[in-house]
């Protein structure tokens, strides 16, 4: 499937726009704790879920599957959801660019990573405790 150039532009322009606090997770690891407005949540499985919602199950017959996919791509609904799809891929690309090894993870200022939680307060406490021990 070809991704339009405008979608790729949005993807790469927004890939660096996540400084601050970002929770990287998936649908199986819901966010816990209080979430302030300045925290971004990136669900790493969002692109797959959005595509599954858009395309549904395709035929096992390649020609029929191609016809179904072309029909979906030409639909107004696909065009409306294209920006959400590009944004979800941008989040995945940014997680990859940070070198995240696993998720869930809370990332502070694209520099400090706390793995294994989606709770920002708990992650901040772990980070602060670790930083206090550093010389």
Protein language model regions, located:
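Local sequence-structure signature of Cys/Sec-based thiol-disulfide redox active-site neighborhoods
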Residues: 18-59, 108
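C-terminal partner/receptor-binding element of secreted or periplasmic proteins
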Residues: 116-135
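Conserved segment of the thioredoxin-like fold in thiol-based oxidoreductases
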Residues: 55, 60-83
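Thioredoxin-like thiol-disulfide oxidoreductase module
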Residues: 77-100
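Extracytoplasmic
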Residues: 36, 100-101
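A short, hydrophobic beta-strand/beta-hairpin element that forms part of a small beta-sheet core
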Residues: 103-114
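Sec-dependent signal peptide recognition
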Residues: 1-10
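N-terminal signal peptide c-region/cleavage motif recognized by signal peptidases
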Residues: 14-16
């Amino acid at each position: 499937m070809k991704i339009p150039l405008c979608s790729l532009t949005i993807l790469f322009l927004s890939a660096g726009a996540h400084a601050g606090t970002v929770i990287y997770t998936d649908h199986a690891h819901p966010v816990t704790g209080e979430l302030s407005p300045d925290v971004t949540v990136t669900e790493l499985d969002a692109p797959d879920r959005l595509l599954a919602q858009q395309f549904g199950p395709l035929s096992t017959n390649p020609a029929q599957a191609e016809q179904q996919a072309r029909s979906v791509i030409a639909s107004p609904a696909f065009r409306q959801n294209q920006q959400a799809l590009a944004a979800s891929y941008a989040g995945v690309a940014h997680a990859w660019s940070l070198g995240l090894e696993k998720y869930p993870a809370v990332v502070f200022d694209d520099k400090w990573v706390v793995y294994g939680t989606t709770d920002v307060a708990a992650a901040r406490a772990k980070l602060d405790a670790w930083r206090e021990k550093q010389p």
